[in-house]
Amino acid sequence: MSNEAKCPFHQAAGNGTSNRDWWPNQLDLSILHRHSSLSDPMGKDFNYAQAFEKLDLAAVKRDLHALMTTSQDWWPADFGHYGGLFIRMAWHSAGTYRTADGRGGAGEGQQRFAPLNSWPDNANLDKARRLLWPIKQKYGRAISWADLLILTGNVALESMGFKTFGFAGGRADTWEPEDVYWGSEKIWLELSGGPNSRYSGDRQLENPLAAVQMGLIYVNPEGPDGNPDPVAAARDIRDTFARMAMNDEETVALIAGGHTFGKTHGAGPASNVGAEPEAAGIEAQGLGWKSAYRTGKGADAITSGLEVTWTTTPTQWSHNFFENLFGYEWELTKSPAGAHQWVAKGADAVIPDAFDPSKKHRPTMLTTDLSLRFDPAYEKISRRFHENPEQFADAFARAWFKLTHRDMGPRARYLGPEVPAEVLLWQDPIPAVDHPLIDAADAAELKAKVLASGLTVSQLVSTAWAAASTFRGSDKRGGANGARIRLAPQKDWEANQPEQLAAVLETLEAIRTAFNGAQRGGKQVSLADLIVLAGCAGVEQAAKNAGHAVTVPFAPGRADASQEQTDVESMAVLEPVADGFRNYLKGKYRVPAEVLLVDKAQLLTLSAPEMTVLLGGLRVLGANVGQSRHGVFTAREQALTNDFFVNLLDMGTEWKPTAADADVFEGRDRATGELKWTGTRVDLVFGSHSQLRALAEVYGSADAQEKFVRDFVAVWNKVMNLDRFDLA
């Protein structure tokens, strides 16, 4: 018998057939429990913002400047300068961001972890991060990997003569992979049209995805599915960049600006390239893509398989990209690796070689570069940039800053001496508070007026929830601060019940106006604060109705944004297509409603227990959209009781679907057949899913009422303050 067969630990914890293998459709709650303190080596007392503020950023930048031109034999620098490599590293760190759910982006340093560290489009960026390790090692906890990756991209640009728009720190590292849906394909770079394709119909890309193929950051540089058609590629570019929050002008600026520097690598056939980092042997120490082609590095490097250098100035900011784009006619050719690319027809060899100063090459371009000339809208912008270099430089600086900071959320999170003073619309700006805040006595007075106004508990709670629950922990957008629920587009969202919302806001505005008018010394309450305070009053009244006296925590300090400070198109992506906490579905989806509930809970940074107690409380408070009775398992509505759990777990009730699609269910008395309740999948999952049922049993027990109220108040307060970065 072999030693392996004798080993008593061969089937240690974590090995063997998993629940997911047996029941692949089982609701997965694991995304609610990522990034716990158990995986964080920094300890609960570590505050990254405080550590970063003590950092000598100028010293870090000096070290980065020196690194740019200190070529290492184990991975030599193209043209003697690592700038192009580090721009790509920073771009690909930030470029996974997508607007649909706010996931991806540079904010957590996820490029260090699978799957991103092993995506084909990130080939050889493992070398870029290893080049940075001595600097990361030197400054330690004072600068995160997430911040360092972006800062390095900025310094790369600056070291090559480009003036950047600014840099903000504040991206704290996480210590395990984020669980993000990147697509259903099982093969890297799988083409569209297969059984797991992300495309349907007339090349309609699946939401929330933004990249065109599994393992790409943006688009296929050879063209759609490798078809070298610049016009068809432009359609992919426009769709993908829009899903990453970029308009046409920003898109042109980013492509042309980024491709002013460096080169691509396709010295030989891809068959020479070894396994990606996650599949490489343990002796590779986290490095991948080892190439057997000649030396495997420098002039022999293979990354994308394309062999393109765009400009005569690959280590210096210039406008040569547009000069070449419009100055030549282009003919299709193939790289040494066999990839489609384009070469300037009849051109002289004017492009420098990356390693041999005696050699020159003809200008080359990617299919997606030519899209900037042959797509009519892109061409118009490109020619304007060509004729107005200062406009191009400004547009690229702004687009680069947006690319690398889009997922950071509000300016309140920006740290460091290089934060630009200019406030940008895409940052969802909120005015600074310029008046004294209300105190506890004022809050009590306002709550009394709200409760005497005729507004119901359900109206108060549902309005506060609608305002606060737009928050996304992914890109830190949304939340109650700013009171944007009173502005377009939020005031018109179906989930926000526009007619009821308008009536509630009118009443609250009258209370606010009267209160502010009666103050001396400039004290005021913002509508944003009053919306949250009114919701707290509703929760307190509901607890009182259930026999419990509680005070819901409240922290004033929110301000009211204006319509002019709100980008309607950008804000539209926050509209809920599903909110299980309000038993709301905008339409029918392939994904079951309970999966959408867990997704919403994860964006709200909730744990499974928090999700459970919150939903059970909101049901009995009548927070459903349209006053739906689904899931309102109580005869004491607007009282904060644990009735939802008690009645869901009652074995005297038998549940059956009302239709074949099993989205809505009737609960009837087992003995008499009398209809007792109706519920949705989102309601019944708390009785059917074993882990959620275990949580429901905690809150449905005879001794649970006080704990239920206490836990509900805690998670309510958490959601109301998710966007209060000023309180951190």
Swiss-Prot record:
One GO cellular-component annotation of the UniProt record comes to: cytosol
Tell whether Chaperone is among the UniProt keywords. Answer: no
Checking HAMAP family in the record gives: Catal_peroxid
Per the record, the covalent cross-link Tryptophyl-tyrosyl-methioninium (Trp-Tyr) (with M-244) lies at: W91-Y218
Give the Enzyme Commission number: 1.11.1.21
Similarity comment text for this entry = Belongs to the peroxidase family. Peroxidase/catalase subfamily.
* Superkingdom, taxonomy of origin: Bacteria
Keyword match Metal-binding? yes
This protein's cofactor list reads: heme b
Binding residue positions for heme b: H259
One GO molecular-function annotation for this sequence? metal ion binding
How does the cofactor attach, per the note?
A: Binds 1 heme b (iron(II)-protoporphyrin IX) group per subunit.
Cited Gene3D superfamilies: 1.10.520.10, Peroxidase, domain 2
Supply the PANTHER family for this chain. CATALASE-PEROXIDASE, HYDROPEROXIDASE I, BIFUNCTIONAL CATALASE-PEROXIDASE
- According to its UniProt entry, this protein's organism is Burkholderia pseudomallei (strain K96243)
Q: What is this protein called?
A: Catalase-peroxidase
Active-site residues annotated for this sequence: H92 (proton acceptor)
Instruction: Note the site residues: Transition state stabilizer.
Output: R88
Q: pH dependence, per the record?
A: Optimum pH is 4.5 for the peroxidase reaction, 6.0 for the catalase reaction, and 8.75 for the NADH oxidase reaction.
List UniProt keywords, sorted A-Z.
Heme, Hydrogen peroxide, Iron, Metal-binding, Oxidoreductase, Peroxidase
Instruction: Tell me a GO biological process for this protein.
Output: cellular response to hydrogen peroxide
